[in-house]
């Protein structure tokens, strides 16, 4: 038998059986479900190849309202004994894939990187742009929630255990896994919406072109609508929402995989829009070539977050519904963590660039000194009135506010 491996359909059947048997056996919720398979088989043989309603309630702890649905799944009172005694014979050829221990390293690395990026952003806003603005506080809130998301993902990794397959876990693990994953699924659209809105508010504050402001309105409205729809959809996918306690009562109202793919695709669309919105303002600036290249790069880093969003959609498509090949959602957690952190890091890049120019102008700019927000405005006015050679106003503005024009709240 050791040379044979169960086919995909057989594996999927065993995975499904594990969830139903676990939900119907509260007395054995602490045991690995493959062991519970054997307990059922041994019990049925010892009981004259029978498994009655009373047996389930008294000896396995099945709730009375769960007995009939449980028996129906396995073919009724006659079929259930046959199925459950045959199931242990499948165990020797079932695969036992392990979870990749990637969540904790990702959490540690990105916590350090994102903390540094957000810290430098706030320092830049305070030192160069004259103070921390409302959109910076929103980004800071998004950063805090991203850290919480990562910490919950670490817990999700812990409760999932070392193995992917449901039959290699206990029902207690399964219930906690369902609970934590639902929390993560609801958290994601809220955090992503918060980060995107903070960036759009920044663009709105620095925009002078009407069509750019309208683009901000449209993208912001789409982002908010998508986030609200995602949260509501995830909450309505299960009724009651604590479906792990009502697993045999058909709590699954619809498959959330397709909506998650749609919401993810809309977020990518907004990523592209946010990437394009500042470009007209950047290209209109009369900067030295090296400075313009740096500005374009700083505002284009969001493309990296777009790529991460694409990989997250791939992970949802691959891992959201269990199959004979995959039965763990930890890769979705991993790509979501990567996407959220990269979005924050990329959103902080323009501010970090301004801070670098402020303290090291010879490295990132041909200008000999740093500027304050008030100095940039007064300098351009005096240049026009006196005719003296001055640094272009547009270049100062970019250094002060990380944008093509001086923010409205700075001047």
Curated annotation (Swiss-Prot):
<comment type="similarity">
    <text>Belongs to the SAT4 family.</text>
</comment>
<keyword id="KW-1003">Cell membrane</keyword>
<dbReference type="GO" id="GO:0005886">
    <property type="term" value="C:plasma membrane"/>
</dbReference>
<feature type="region of interest" description="Disordered">
    <location>
        <begin position="371"/>
        <end position="411"/>
    </location>
</feature>
<feature type="topological domain" description="Cytoplasmic">
    <location>
        <begin position="284"/>
        <end position="292"/>
    </location>
</feature>
<protein>
    <recommendedName>
        <fullName>Receptor GIN3</fullName>
    </recommendedName>
</protein>
<feature type="topological domain" description="Cytoplasmic">
    <location>
        <begin position="350"/>
        <end position="411"/>
    </location>
</feature>
<feature type="topological domain" description="Extracellular">
    <location>
        <begin position="1"/>
        <end position="99"/>
    </location>
</feature>
<feature type="topological domain" description="Extracellular">
    <location>
        <begin position="314"/>
        <end position="328"/>
    </location>
</feature>
<feature type="glycosylation site" description="N-linked (GlcNAc...) asparagine">
    <location>
        <position position="326"/>
    </location>
</feature>
<keyword id="KW-0325">Glycoprotein</keyword>
<dbReference type="Pfam" id="PF20684">
    <property type="entry name" value="Fung_rhodopsin"/>
</dbReference>
<comment type="subunit">
    <text>Interacts with guanine nucleotide-binding protein alpha GPA2; to activate adenylate cyclase and positively regulate nematode trap formation.</text>
</comment>
<feature type="topological domain" description="Cytoplasmic">
    <location>
        <begin position="121"/>
        <end position="134"/>
    </location>
</feature>
<feature type="transmembrane region" description="Helical">
    <location>
        <begin position="293"/>
        <end position="313"/>
    </location>
</feature>
<feature type="topological domain" description="Extracellular">
    <location>
        <begin position="249"/>
        <end position="262"/>
    </location>
</feature>
<feature type="transmembrane region" description="Helical">
    <location>
        <begin position="182"/>
        <end position="202"/>
    </location>
</feature>
<feature type="topological domain" description="Cytoplasmic">
    <location>
        <begin position="203"/>
        <end position="227"/>
    </location>
</feature>
<keyword id="KW-1133">Transmembrane helix</keyword>
<feature type="transmembrane region" description="Helical">
    <location>
        <begin position="228"/>
        <end position="248"/>
    </location>
</feature>
<keyword id="KW-0472">Membrane</keyword>
<feature type="glycosylation site" description="N-linked (GlcNAc...) asparagine">
    <location>
        <position position="321"/>
    </location>
</feature>
<feature type="transmembrane region" description="Helical">
    <location>
        <begin position="135"/>
        <end position="155"/>
    </location>
</feature>
<feature type="compositionally biased region" description="Low complexity">
    <location>
        <begin position="372"/>
        <end position="389"/>
    </location>
</feature>
<keyword id="KW-0812">Transmembrane</keyword>
<feature type="transmembrane region" description="Helical">
    <location>
        <begin position="329"/>
        <end position="349"/>
    </location>
</feature>
<comment type="function">
    <text>Receptor that senses nematode-derived signals at the cell surface and signals via adenylate cyclase to positively regulate trap formation for nematode capture.</text>
</comment>
<feature type="transmembrane region" description="Helical">
    <location>
        <begin position="100"/>
        <end position="120"/>
    </location>
</feature>
<feature type="topological domain" description="Extracellular">
    <location>
        <begin position="156"/>
        <end position="181"/>
    </location>
</feature>
<dbReference type="InterPro" id="IPR049326">
    <property type="entry name" value="Rhodopsin_dom_fungi"/>
</dbReference>
<feature type="transmembrane region" description="Helical">
    <location>
        <begin position="263"/>
        <end position="283"/>
    </location>
</feature>
<dbReference type="InterPro" id="IPR052337">
    <property type="entry name" value="SAT4-like"/>
</dbReference>
